[in-house]
């Protein structure tokens, strides 16, 4: 807060000191990377390029953070996350004689996915820890995304074979087909539900993308479709309403189709974003806008979704236009169905397309 306040006032020396303290005393990698990245910006603003380079390189090592990915892009480095995203092949021969594995496969074949989840997790608890990476890949092959995610977070420490499992890529498709790039949809599903298809929030939001039944009902009515809340437990239906709502937010004047604002509206609703448009003095800087969002949950949500989105693009070996744009302090627009992103630089209220 102190650093950002000084930054807005143009006191970059005070901002540098504040951001340096954030980086040194951070309690987690996300906060440390943020302190390093903004410290690097302040170092450049105070004409200390050697300090800028040092801080950017340190931030880039925190490869699974929002600012770590931005730092790597700004330096022209291949992100560590892209190197790790290369998935090995499933070694079925080492698993095919394990009863719990055979049971899980059989259960998936008859549509009993929750029981299959239980069987694979039980095998992980009683089996050879060296098989966790293989079991994670099997969970992915069986479309057991929540269990694959579980392996990614509860597998052996520092095991890179399960790091990709933290970002499942299930073979699902919305009922109306993909109109929004899957990387962005899965980025939301990961944060909203950890890919649990039947989870219900205290507010009543349901399923993968935590869609509110009232929101889905309105979208269905506009299309002349029938709707039942229980349908949101089905991946294809939930993804359809989730992407439809993102499209609706994209087309609202208050978001301008800019990706960070669409993501913020998905979390907080359109009305707060409309208010922030007039209250936040971001000087055309998208990163300053994100850090100035007054709702701490939404502020963190935007960074997490973008981080997830970029890593999904890396998993699919795709370029990331939004990452490239934000690393140059430009506003990324909402991606098209192929994931292509255009960016715009906004300075003093003037929008210059690039």
Regions found by a protein language model. Give the residues of each.
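Tandem amphipathic alpha-helical repeat scaffolds
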Residues: 3-5, 41
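Acidic, serine/threonine-rich low-complexity intrinsically disordered linkers/hinges in large eukaryotic
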Residues: 83-112, 322-323, 327, 336-339
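Repeat-mediated protein-protein interaction surfaces in helical alpha-solenoids
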Residues: 13-23, 76-89, 111-120
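Catalytic glycan-binding domains that act on GlcNAc-containing polysaccharides
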Residues: 5-14, 25-34, 46-51, 55-59, ...
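Alpha-helix initiation and capping sites
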Residues: 64, 97, 113, 128-129
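Non-catalytic alpha-helical coupling and interface elements of nucleotide-dependent molecular machines
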Residues: 64, 76-80, 310
């Amino acid at each position: 807060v102190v650093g950002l306040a000084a930054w807005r006032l143009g006191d970059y020396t005070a901002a540098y000191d504040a951001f340096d303290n954030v980086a040194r005393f951070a309690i987690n990698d996300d906060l440390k990377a943020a302190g390093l990245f903004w410290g690097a910006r302040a170092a450049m603003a105070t004409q200390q390029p050697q300090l800028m380079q040092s801080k950017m390189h340190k931030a880039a090592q925190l490869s699974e953070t929002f600012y770590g990915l931005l730092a790597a892009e700004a330096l022209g480095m291949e992100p560590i996350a892209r190197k790790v995203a290369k998935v090995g092949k499933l070694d079925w021969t080492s698993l095919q004689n394990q009863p719990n594995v055979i049971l899980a496969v059989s259960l998936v074949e008859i549509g009993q996915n929750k029981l299959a989840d239980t069987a694979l997790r039980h095998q992980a608890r009683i089996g050879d820890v060296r098989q966790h990476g293989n079991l994670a890949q099997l969970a992915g092959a069986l479309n057991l995304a929540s269990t694959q995610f579980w392996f990614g977070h509860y597998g052996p420490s520092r095991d890179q074979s399960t790091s990709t499992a933290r970002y499942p890529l299930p073979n699902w498709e919305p009922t109306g087909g993909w109109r929004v790039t899957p990387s962005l949809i899965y980025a939301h599903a990961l944060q909203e539900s950890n890919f649990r298809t039947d989870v219900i929030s205290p507010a009543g939001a349901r399923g993968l993308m935590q869609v509110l039944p009232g929101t889905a009902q309105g979208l269905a009515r506009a299309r002349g479709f029938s709707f039942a809340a229980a349908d949101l437990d089905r991946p294809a239906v939930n993804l359809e309403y989730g992407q439809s709502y993102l499209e609706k937010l994209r087309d609202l004047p208050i978001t301008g189709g800019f990706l960070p604002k669409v993501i913020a509206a998905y979390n907080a609703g359109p009305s707060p974003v409309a208010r922030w448009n007039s209250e936040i003095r971001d000087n055309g800087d998208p990163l300053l806008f994100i850090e100035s969002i007054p709702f701490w949950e939404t502020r963190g949500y935007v960074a997490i979704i973008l981080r997830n989105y970029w890593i999904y693009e890396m998993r699919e070996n795709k370029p990331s236009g939004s990452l490239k744009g934000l690393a140059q302090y430009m506003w990324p627009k909402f991606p098209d169905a192929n994931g292509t992103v255009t960016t715009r630089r906004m300075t003093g209220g003037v929008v210059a397309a690039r």
